[in-house]
Protein backbone atom coordinates (compact mmCIF):
# COMPACT_ATOMS: atom_id res chain seq x y z
CA UNK A 1 0.00 0.00 0.00
CA UNK A 2 1.59 3.28 -1.13
CA UNK A 3 -1.15 5.57 0.07
CA UNK A 4 0.12 8.41 2.25
CA UNK A 5 -0.75 8.45 5.92
CA UNK A 6 -3.97 10.33 6.62
CA UNK A 7 -3.95 13.50 8.70
CA UNK A 8 -5.21 11.72 11.81
CA UNK A 9 -1.94 9.77 11.99
CA UNK A 10 0.28 12.85 11.96
CA UNK A 11 2.00 13.39 15.29
CA UNK A 12 3.09 16.63 16.91
CA UNK A 13 6.62 16.28 18.21
CA UNK A 14 6.73 17.51 21.78
CA UNK A 15 8.83 16.66 24.80
CA UNK A 16 11.98 15.94 22.78
CA UNK A 17 14.28 17.58 25.36
CA UNK A 18 13.00 15.51 28.27
CA UNK A 19 13.09 12.37 26.13
CA UNK A 20 16.90 12.66 26.00
CA UNK A 21 16.98 12.45 29.81
CA UNK A 22 15.08 9.16 29.67
CA UNK A 23 17.35 7.76 26.95
CA UNK A 24 20.45 8.71 28.94
CA UNK A 25 19.10 6.99 32.06
CA UNK A 26 18.20 3.83 30.12
CA UNK A 27 21.71 3.67 28.69
CA UNK A 28 23.26 4.17 32.15
CA UNK A 29 21.20 1.33 33.61
CA UNK A 30 21.63 -0.95 30.56
CA UNK A 31 17.88 -1.12 30.01
CA UNK A 32 15.82 -1.55 26.86
CA UNK A 33 12.37 -0.21 26.09
CA UNK A 34 9.84 -1.59 23.64
CA UNK A 35 9.23 2.06 22.75
CA UNK A 36 12.62 2.25 21.04
CA UNK A 37 12.90 -1.34 19.78
CA UNK A 38 9.42 -1.35 18.20
CA UNK A 39 9.85 2.15 16.72
CA UNK A 40 6.68 3.34 18.46
CA UNK A 41 5.11 6.52 17.01
CA UNK A 42 4.43 7.83 20.52
CA UNK A 43 8.01 7.53 21.78
CA UNK A 44 8.85 11.23 22.03
CA UNK A 45 5.57 12.05 23.77
CA UNK A 46 5.92 9.23 26.29
CA UNK A 47 9.60 9.84 26.98
CA UNK A 48 8.78 13.53 27.27
CA UNK A 49 6.28 12.62 30.00
CA UNK A 50 9.00 10.43 31.57
CA UNK A 51 7.12 7.22 30.99
CA UNK A 52 8.41 4.08 29.30
CA UNK A 53 7.63 0.41 28.81
CA UNK A 54 10.65 -1.58 29.93
CA UNK A 55 11.63 -4.56 27.79
CA UNK A 56 13.42 -7.23 29.78
CA UNK A 57 15.29 -10.42 28.80
CA UNK A 58 17.44 -8.67 26.21
CA UNK A 59 16.63 -7.04 22.90
CA UNK A 60 16.63 -10.06 20.58
CA UNK A 61 13.49 -12.15 19.98
CA UNK A 62 13.16 -15.84 19.06
CA UNK A 63 9.93 -15.29 17.08
CA UNK A 64 9.47 -13.88 13.57
CA UNK A 65 6.20 -11.93 13.67
CA UNK A 66 5.93 -9.96 10.44
CA UNK A 67 4.51 -6.82 12.07
CA UNK A 68 7.24 -6.32 14.66
CA UNK A 69 10.42 -4.25 14.50
CA UNK A 70 12.20 -5.97 17.42
CA UNK A 71 15.46 -7.68 16.37
CA UNK A 72 15.28 -11.41 15.66
CA UNK A 73 18.19 -13.83 15.97
CA UNK A 74 20.64 -15.17 18.54
CA UNK A 75 19.55 -14.22 22.04
CA UNK A 76 21.61 -12.73 24.83
CA UNK A 77 22.36 -13.98 28.34
CA UNK A 78 19.81 -12.89 30.92
CA UNK A 79 21.08 -9.90 32.93
CA UNK A 80 20.85 -10.75 36.65
CA UNK A 81 21.03 -7.03 37.52
CA UNK A 82 18.04 -6.16 35.37
CA UNK A 83 15.34 -6.45 38.10
CA UNK A 84 17.26 -4.02 40.33
CA UNK A 85 17.97 -1.69 37.42
CA UNK A 86 14.29 -1.59 36.43
CA UNK A 87 13.35 -0.76 40.02
CA UNK A 88 15.95 2.03 40.04
CA UNK A 89 14.63 3.45 36.76
CA UNK A 90 11.06 3.42 38.08
CA UNK A 91 12.25 5.29 41.17
CA UNK A 92 14.19 7.90 39.16
CA UNK A 93 11.24 8.51 36.83
CA UNK A 94 8.81 8.71 39.72
CA UNK A 95 6.40 6.35 37.99
CA UNK A 96 3.04 5.45 39.50
CA UNK A 97 2.27 2.86 36.80
CA UNK A 98 4.96 0.76 35.14
CA UNK A 99 4.68 -1.63 32.21
CA UNK A 100 7.15 -4.51 31.93
CA UNK A 101 7.31 -6.48 28.70
CA UNK A 102 9.90 -8.71 27.06
CA UNK A 103 11.11 -10.22 23.87
CA UNK A 104 9.87 -13.79 23.44
CA UNK A 105 12.49 -16.21 24.78
CA UNK A 106 11.52 -19.67 23.52
CA UNK A 107 15.15 -20.65 24.17
CA UNK A 108 14.71 -20.45 27.97
CA UNK A 109 13.18 -23.42 29.85
CA UNK A 110 10.51 -21.23 31.47
CA UNK A 111 10.31 -18.69 28.65
CA UNK A 112 11.70 -16.06 31.04
CA UNK A 113 8.81 -16.32 33.51
CA UNK A 114 11.13 -16.52 36.51
CA UNK A 115 12.88 -13.33 35.43
CA UNK A 116 9.52 -11.57 35.07
CA UNK A 117 8.72 -12.66 38.62
CA UNK A 118 12.00 -11.24 39.94
CA UNK A 119 11.29 -7.86 38.34
CA UNK A 120 7.75 -7.79 39.77
CA UNK A 121 9.01 -8.75 43.23
CA UNK A 122 11.49 -5.85 43.16
CA UNK A 123 8.64 -3.46 42.39
CA UNK A 124 5.95 -4.82 44.70
CA UNK A 125 7.20 -3.08 47.89
CA UNK A 126 6.64 0.28 46.17
CA UNK A 127 3.34 2.08 45.54
CA UNK A 128 3.63 1.60 41.78
CA UNK A 129 0.96 -0.28 39.80
CA UNK A 130 2.74 -3.12 37.99
CA UNK A 131 1.50 -4.17 34.56
CA UNK A 132 3.21 -7.02 32.73
CA UNK A 133 2.85 -7.58 28.99
CA UNK A 134 3.89 -11.19 28.57
CA UNK A 135 4.56 -13.61 25.69
CA UNK A 136 2.58 -16.86 25.46
CA UNK A 137 5.28 -19.01 27.14
CA UNK A 138 4.41 -21.64 24.48
CA UNK A 139 1.30 -22.49 26.47
CA UNK A 140 3.24 -23.46 29.61
CA UNK A 141 0.74 -23.01 32.45
CA UNK A 142 3.46 -23.45 35.09
CA UNK A 143 5.42 -20.54 33.60
CA UNK A 144 2.27 -18.41 33.63
CA UNK A 145 1.65 -19.37 37.26
CA UNK A 146 5.19 -18.22 38.13
CA UNK A 147 4.33 -14.73 36.86
CA UNK A 148 0.86 -14.70 38.46
CA UNK A 149 2.23 -15.71 41.88
CA UNK A 150 4.52 -12.67 41.83
CA UNK A 151 1.30 -10.61 42.01
CA UNK A 152 1.32 -8.06 39.18
CA UNK A 153 -1.75 -5.83 39.19
CA UNK A 154 -2.41 -6.26 35.45
CA UNK A 155 -1.63 -9.26 33.23
CA UNK A 156 -1.49 -8.15 29.59
CA UNK A 157 -1.15 -10.51 26.64
CA UNK A 158 -1.93 -9.19 23.18
CA UNK A 159 -4.10 -11.19 20.79
CA UNK A 160 -2.68 -8.84 18.08
CA UNK A 161 -4.90 -9.77 15.09
CA UNK A 162 -7.82 -11.87 13.90
CA UNK A 163 -7.43 -15.68 13.62
CA UNK A 164 -7.44 -15.70 9.79
CA UNK A 165 -4.29 -13.56 9.65
CA UNK A 166 -2.19 -15.49 12.18
CA UNK A 167 -0.40 -17.58 9.54
CA UNK A 168 1.07 -14.48 7.90
CA UNK A 169 1.23 -12.05 10.84
CA UNK A 170 2.15 -14.33 13.77
CA UNK A 171 3.38 -17.60 12.20
CA UNK A 172 4.88 -19.02 15.41
CA UNK A 173 1.94 -18.05 17.62
CA UNK A 174 -1.56 -19.46 18.12
CA UNK A 175 -4.81 -17.56 18.53
CA UNK A 176 -6.29 -20.35 20.65
CA UNK A 177 -3.18 -20.49 22.84
CA UNK A 178 -3.33 -16.75 23.50
CA UNK A 179 -6.99 -16.96 24.51
CA UNK A 180 -6.17 -19.92 26.75
CA UNK A 181 -3.44 -17.89 28.47
CA UNK A 182 -5.90 -15.12 29.32
CA UNK A 183 -8.44 -17.70 30.52
CA UNK A 184 -5.84 -19.47 32.67
CA UNK A 185 -4.73 -16.16 34.19
CA UNK A 186 -8.20 -15.63 35.65
CA UNK A 187 -8.35 -19.23 36.86
CA UNK A 188 -5.00 -18.88 38.63
CA UNK A 189 -5.92 -15.52 40.19
CA UNK A 190 -9.55 -14.41 39.81
CA UNK A 191 -8.63 -11.00 41.25
CA UNK A 192 -6.07 -10.10 38.62
CA UNK A 193 -6.98 -7.63 35.87
CA UNK A 194 -6.38 -9.07 32.41
CA UNK A 195 -5.73 -6.99 29.32
CA UNK A 196 -5.27 -7.57 25.61
CA UNK A 197 -4.77 -5.59 22.44
CA UNK A 198 -5.40 -5.85 18.72
CA UNK A 199 -3.94 -4.02 15.71
CA UNK A 200 -6.19 -3.13 12.79
CA UNK A 201 -5.36 -2.28 9.20
CA UNK A 202 -3.73 -5.65 8.46
CA UNK A 203 -6.53 -6.80 6.17
CA UNK A 204 -9.10 -7.89 8.74
CA UNK A 205 -12.83 -7.37 8.30
CA UNK A 206 -14.99 -5.44 10.76
CA UNK A 207 -16.98 -8.53 11.74
CA UNK A 208 -13.73 -10.40 12.44
CA UNK A 209 -12.66 -7.71 14.91
CA UNK A 210 -16.04 -7.89 16.66
CA UNK A 211 -15.64 -11.68 16.91
CA UNK A 212 -12.22 -11.24 18.56
CA UNK A 213 -13.73 -8.86 21.12
CA UNK A 214 -16.41 -11.47 21.86
CA UNK A 215 -13.74 -14.14 22.31
CA UNK A 216 -11.82 -11.89 24.72
CA UNK A 217 -14.91 -11.21 26.80
CA UNK A 218 -15.67 -14.94 26.84
CA UNK A 219 -12.41 -15.45 28.79
CA UNK A 220 -13.27 -12.49 31.07
CA UNK A 221 -10.68 -10.06 29.68
CA UNK A 222 -11.10 -6.72 31.50
CA UNK A 223 -9.06 -4.13 29.59
CA UNK A 224 -8.67 -3.60 25.85
CA UNK A 225 -6.55 -1.59 23.41
CA UNK A 226 -7.16 -1.19 19.67
CA UNK A 227 -4.73 0.72 17.45
CA UNK A 228 -3.75 1.24 13.81
CA UNK A 229 -1.00 -1.04 12.49
CA UNK A 230 1.91 0.92 11.01
CA UNK A 231 4.56 -1.03 9.12
CA UNK A 232 8.04 -0.38 10.58
CA UNK A 233 9.64 -0.86 7.13
CA UNK A 234 8.99 -2.12 3.60
CA UNK A 235 10.18 -5.56 4.74
CA UNK A 236 7.36 -5.92 7.25
CA UNK A 237 3.73 -6.86 6.70
CA UNK A 238 2.19 -4.05 4.62
CA UNK A 239 -0.54 -1.76 5.88
CA UNK A 240 -3.64 -2.88 3.99
CA UNK A 241 -5.90 -0.07 5.19
CA UNK A 242 -5.80 3.06 7.32
CA UNK A 243 -8.83 2.68 9.56
CA UNK A 244 -10.95 5.82 10.01
CA UNK A 245 -11.27 7.18 13.58
CA UNK A 246 -15.05 6.69 13.38
CA UNK A 247 -14.58 2.93 13.16
CA UNK A 248 -12.25 3.03 16.17
CA UNK A 249 -15.03 4.81 18.05
CA UNK A 250 -17.50 2.14 16.96
CA UNK A 251 -15.19 -0.62 18.21
CA UNK A 252 -14.87 1.22 21.52
CA UNK A 253 -18.63 1.55 21.93
CA UNK A 254 -19.20 -2.11 21.03
CA UNK A 255 -16.49 -3.23 23.47
CA UNK A 256 -17.99 -1.26 26.35
CA UNK A 257 -21.39 -2.75 25.54
CA UNK A 258 -19.80 -6.19 25.81
CA UNK A 259 -18.62 -5.42 29.33
CA UNK A 260 -14.96 -4.43 29.06
CA UNK A 261 -14.00 -2.28 32.07
CA UNK A 262 -11.67 -0.02 30.06
CA UNK A 263 -11.20 0.46 26.32
CA UNK A 264 -8.62 2.58 24.47
CA UNK A 265 -9.43 2.58 20.75
CA UNK A 266 -7.80 5.15 18.51
CA UNK A 267 -5.39 5.14 15.55
CA UNK A 268 -2.36 6.00 17.71
CA UNK A 269 -3.19 3.71 20.63
CA UNK A 270 -0.55 1.14 21.49
CA UNK A 271 -0.74 -1.55 24.13
CA UNK A 272 0.90 0.50 26.86
CA UNK A 273 0.10 4.02 25.62
CA UNK A 274 -1.29 6.04 28.55
CA UNK A 275 -1.45 2.76 30.48
CA UNK A 276 -1.84 4.66 33.76
CA UNK A 277 -5.31 5.80 32.65
CA UNK A 278 -6.67 2.59 34.20
CA UNK A 279 -5.42 3.45 37.70
CA UNK A 280 -8.91 4.45 38.86
CA UNK A 281 -10.13 0.96 37.97
CA UNK A 282 -7.26 -0.86 39.66
CA UNK A 283 -7.74 1.14 42.86
From Swiss-Prot:
Main location, first listed in the record: cytoplasm
Co-factor(s): [4Fe-4S] cluster
Keyword 4Fe-4S: yes
Pathways involved: Protein modification; protein lipoylation via endogenous pathway; protein N(6)-(lipoyl)lysine from octanoyl-[acyl-carrier-protein]: step 2/2
Cofactor detail note: Binds 2 [4Fe-4S] clusters per subunit. One cluster is coordinated with 3 cysteines and an exchangeable S-adenosyl-L-methionine.
Keywords: 4Fe-4S, Cytoplasm, Iron, Iron-sulfur, Metal-binding, S-adenosyl-L-methionine, Transferase
Location in the cell: Cytoplasm
Domain Radical SAM core: residue ranges: 47-261
EC number: 2.8.1.8
Pfam families: LIAS_N (PF16881), Radical_SAM (PF04055)
Residues that coordinate or bind [4Fe-4S] cluster 1: 35, 40, 46, 272
Record SUPFAM superfamilies: Radical SAM enzymes
GO cellular component: cytoplasm
Matches recorded under CDD domains: Radical_SAM
Catalytic activity: [[Fe-S] cluster scaffold protein carrying a second [4Fe-4S](2+) cluster] + N(6)-octanoyl-L-lysyl-[protein] + 2 oxidized [2Fe-2S]-[ferredoxin] + 2 S-adenosyl-L-methionine + 4 H(+) = [[Fe-S] cluster scaffold protein] + N(6)-[(R)-dihydrolipoyl]-L-lysyl-[protein] + 4 Fe(3+) + 2 hydrogen sulfide + 2 5'-deoxyadenosine + 2 L-methionine + 2 reduced [2Fe-2S]-[ferredoxin]
Enzyme class: transferase
Molecular-function GO terms, alphabetical: 4 iron, 4 sulfur cluster binding; lipoate synthase activity; metal ion binding
Chain sites annotated for binding [4Fe-4S] cluster 2: 61, 65, 68
NCBIfam families according to UniProt: lipA (TIGR00510), PRK05481.1 (NF004019), PRK12928.1 (NF009544)
Family: Belongs to the radical SAM superfamily. Lipoyl synthase family.
Protein name: Lipoyl synthase
